[in-house]
Amino acid sequence: MKDCAIARAKEAGAYNDGDAVIIMTGANQGIDLTAKAIINKGDKIIVENPSFIGSLNAFRTYECELLGVDVEADGMDVCKLEETLKANPDAKLLYTIPTFQNPTGTTMTLEKRKRVLELASEYNLLIIEDNPYGDLRFNGEDVATLKSMDTENRVIYCGSFSKILSPGMRLGYVIGPAELLEKVEMLKQVNDVHTPMLTQMMCVQFMKKYDISKYIEKNRKLYKEKCQCMIDAMEEYFPKGKVEWTVPDGGIFLWCICPTIEDIRPVVDKALEKKVAIVPGTNFAIDQNLPSNKFRLNFSSASKSDITEAVKRLGEVLNELL
C-alpha cells in the first residue's frame, strides 16, 4: 500500500528519498494526527478562510488559535498571509488546500505557491498541504505542489485514494520528513493500530489489475460534465445578477455568493424543505457565529438529471428570498 501511495505522490512530485509514508484511514485522519503531533495549546495556526470544516474542527480540538487568511480567485491572499505573519511571527503551522480548495474550488497560482514557501522559510513555518482533489483536474494544466518545491523539509503532504476510487473506502496517506512523522506514526498506532487491511488490499489489487490513470481520466470527464451541467442550470434558474459563483478547473465544488443578503441560512432552510441540501458558508468560517451570504454546492455524486432538478428547486428558493 505504501508503494501505491509513493507512486501517486511521485506523479505530483510530492515524495523525496528519505520521506516517511504513513497510510491513514482517510486523509482527514492524517491531518488530525499530524496536527495532534505538532500543535500545543495556545499555538497559532494559519488557515485559509473559508476552509474545510473537518480540518478546522481537528485544529480546534487542540485548543490552538486559528488565524484566517482570505481566499481569492487565484488562491490564498499571500499579501494578507504576510501581514498575518508579521503580526504573529510565532505562528507554528500553515494549513492549506491549494488545489481545488474546499469549499471555494479555487486553485492557488504557481507564483503564490512560491511566495508561500518563501514566507514559510522566513518565519520558520511548517506547512500541511492537503491535496485530496489534485487528481480531479478537468481543465487547464497541473500546478506544481508545494511539496514538490519544498527544499527545506517544511511541507507535510496529505493525499487521498478515497476521492479517486471510492469515498467509502476512507483511505489516505501522509508523506513528509521522517523526523517530523515519527510522532504521527506513534499516534496512528494508538488511534487505530493500522488502517483496515481489507481496504488496503482492495486498493492495491485494483491498482495492480487496472490502469489507474485511465480510471482517473474517466472520472475527470464525468466531473467536467457534471460541473458544466450544474453551471448551465444555475445560469438558467438562479435570479439574474443576485448570485455569483466560482468556475473551478477541477475538484467537486462550486462556491456561491449572494451579495444582496447578509445571511444565507433562510435559503438553506427553505431549500431543505424542497429536499435540496446546500452547505452554508458559516460552516467553513473561522468564526462560525458570524452570518455568511455564501454557500457550497457539490456535483460529485448526483446524476446530471438530479443536478438540474436540484438547481431548479434551489433557484425557486433564491428567486423567492433574494
Briefly describe each language-model feature range:
Residues 204, 220-231, 243-257, 267-269:
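Conserved glycine-rich beta-strand-loop-beta hairpin in the small C-terminal domain of fold type I
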Residues 62, 122-123, 153, 274, ...:
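Helix C-cap/helix->beta junction micro-motif
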